[in-house]
């Protein structure tokens, strides 16, 4: 199993920090193929602090246990590893299957496995609505990572940055009401630009209309996260797509921020 095909991101569960992993490899091979039962179980670990997350040493120990289970369960027929999440001194792991008996029997022989549970999940709600990251979660995680990148380059996040947000629309008539909302609503920006014609870089790409909004903000506080969440919801409201943001400090090296 290739970890490069695991989607990893941070979120929260019941107000506690959580680290999610979703397996995005061969989903089409298993989804809709009769694997309508989900087997869920937990492994306890020693939390590092009040966050409930493991230390680096404890994490390595935990992942070794996870791989021990993966090796055994993925060798069984008609089994798909959906993912897991780490939160509040536990990792909860999810597998889809046609028949749960062999999985349950295998898990019952592993002394550190707890709380084995089997449920029907005909349309994979747990995978698509819980384990898999939403577009907003992906952008928030990218924002966190790229603020760390700025700091690693010696930049002070309390400085004022020129931040450019980008939006795509598949139809021109969707773009203009969106821009009206930005202009008339409570949105702070220095410039607002759009493409007069649809953009299509490659023959196979779907053409789109582009809107770019620039604003000057500090990246020291939560404002950039609030802006990302606000623009994600606004673009969705007008049937567009919020692509993400980049800033002047990294534009020179053509490094997009998400």
From Swiss-Prot:
What InterPro entries does this protein map onto? CHP01619 (IPR006506), DUF695 (IPR016097), RraB-like_sf (IPR036701), RraB_dom (IPR009671)
User: Taxonomic lineage of this organism?
Assistant: Bacteria, Pseudomonadati, Pseudomonadota, Gammaproteobacteria, Pasteurellales
Which named protein is this?
Answer: Uncharacterized protein HI_0040
Q: What NCBIfam families does its record include?
A: hyp_HI0040 (TIGR01619)
Family matches, as SUPFAM superfamilies: Hypothetical protein VC0424 (SSF89946)
Pfam families assigned to the protein according to its UniProt record, in alphabetical order:
DUF695, RraB
């Amino acid at each position: 199993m290739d970890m490069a095909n695991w989607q990893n991101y941070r979120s929260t569960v019941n107000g506690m920090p959580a680290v999610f992993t979703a397996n995005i490899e061969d989903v089409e091979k298993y989804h809709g193929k009769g694997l309508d039962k989900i087997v869920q179980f937990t492994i306890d670990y020693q939390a590092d602090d009040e966050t409930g997350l493991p230390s680096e040493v404890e994490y390595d120990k935990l992942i070794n246990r996870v791989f021990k289970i993966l090796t055994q369960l993925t060798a069984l027929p008609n089994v798909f590893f959906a993912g897991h999440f780490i939160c509040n001194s536990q990792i909860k792991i999810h597998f889809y299957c046609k028949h749960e008996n062999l999985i349950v029997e295998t898990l019952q022989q592993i002394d550190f496995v707890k709380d084995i549970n089997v449920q029907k999940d005909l349309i994979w709600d747990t995978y698509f609505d819980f384990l898999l990251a939403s577009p907003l979660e992906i952008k928030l995680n990218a924002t966190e990572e790229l603020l760390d990148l700025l700091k690693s380059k010696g930049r002070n996040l309390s400085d004022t940055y020129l931040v450019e947000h980008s939006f795509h629309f598949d139809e021109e008539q969707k773009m203009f009401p969106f821009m009206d909302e930005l202009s008339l609503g409570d949105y702070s920006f220095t410039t607002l630009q759009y493409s007069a014609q649809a953009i299509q870089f490659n023959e196979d790409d779907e053409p789109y209309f582009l809107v770019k909004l620039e604003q000057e903000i500090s990246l020291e506080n939560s404002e950039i996260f609030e802006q990302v969440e606000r623009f994600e919801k606004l673009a969705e409201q007008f049937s567009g797509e919020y692509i993400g943001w980049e800033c002047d400090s990294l534009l020179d090296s053509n490094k997009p921020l998400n």
